[in-house]
Amino acid sequence: MEFLKDKISRRQFLKGAVATAAVAAAGPKLISAGYTPFKSDSLEVWTCGGLSEAFLQINDAYEAKTGHNIQYTGAFAGALGKSLLTLKGQTEMFGARGLELAQNLRKKGISLRFKPLCFTDYVLVVPKGNPAGIRDLQDLAEPGVRVMLPLGASPPGSASVQGILKKSGLTDPVMQNMTVNETCVIKMMCGLVEGNGDASIIEKRLTTHDRFKDKIEYMPIDPKFIPPAPLTFTLNVMKYVKDEKLAEDYSDFVRSDGQEILERNGFTSVHSARGLDLIERFGVKDVQ
């Protein structure tokens, strides 16, 4: 498996991320490998791991434009959120996944305010050329279709896939066709592009990954089948912020110039028609 041998795990390329199991107990310093000492013009930013590829690019652009230093960590959302909610970790800005987490941080006074950041989406993905002729979600239930799913992966990814199958009424037939149940979506994608399966369900952001984008095709899933809870990302200003003016400047950049970068990485901009619709539909507003 040459493709798999050449791959890197989704965590290896995240700036400042290490084993997430230690996060909740140990706080931010253990997840900040390569952490640079705080500077007066620095801003410490955490995001969930799914945003990391985009935020590395956003931070580079912001630093080049302003000269400010962004101390960035991207890691497992659940561990970071738990660390913050239990007061075992501190950061100045937090890109959180799920509106409920942002609301809980706000209610507890751990964050000062939040704004919509972006939205994710889920798609049906097939190897380039679509050898099995997959057309839609229903085709995953057809006899003989080899379905690869990341149900062993950490939530919200695995839970979202299960939710899509449940809402579409396809859980039983698709599970019967599942030939691979992976714990790592990157490893699963490596197998898919090598022809070890016919189709899978993934987050759209993964279709932009350099290792896959030229080796796959994808198609939309009807939004009515996609659970709403994991789609929302928010940008939170935390109570630990040292320079609120810098935090607001960074937030404004992420929500303006940064939106194009997020879209290139497979996310939905908060300024797009779909983004504006989801903000209203989900009530992504900081209301106290």
Residue ranges and their predicted role:
Residues 91-96:
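Periplasmic-binding protein-like
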Residues 22-27:
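Hydrophobic h-region of N-terminal signal peptides that target proteins for export
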Residues 4-6, 29-73, 78-87, 98-99, ...:
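Exported/periplasmic ABC-transporter solute-binding proteins
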Residues 108-113:
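A short, gly/pro- and small-residue-rich
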Residues 15-18:
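Internal alpha-helical transmembrane segments of multi-pass membrane proteins, especially GPCRs
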Residues 1-9, 21:
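N-terminal secretory signal peptides
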